[in-house]
Amino acid sequence: MFTLKKSLLLLFFLGTINLSLCEEERDADEEERRDDPDEMNVEVEKRFLPLVGKILSGLIGK
């Protein structure tokens, strides 16, 4: 019983460390993405182009 508790505790500890490292890496990637102006422009274009397409198709269709 004691060895089972030890191994479960070890798995929990390793899983917690792995999860925290993944969160830190994801946060760093998000900060890096926000700081890079080229990628910000690409994100704006991705949001802007479909909107323009819908507006133009609405105007042409009428």
UniProtKB/Swiss-Prot annotation:
GO terms for cellular component: extracellular region. The modification Isoleucine amide is found at I60. Transmembrane segments: none annotated. Belongs to the frog skin active peptide (FSAP) family. Temporin subfamily. It comes from Odorrana versabilis (Chinese bamboo leaf odorous frog). Residues 23-45 form a propeptide. One of its GO terms (biological process) is defense response to Gram-positive bacterium. Coiled coil: none annotated. The keyword Transmembrane does not apply. This is Temporin-1V.
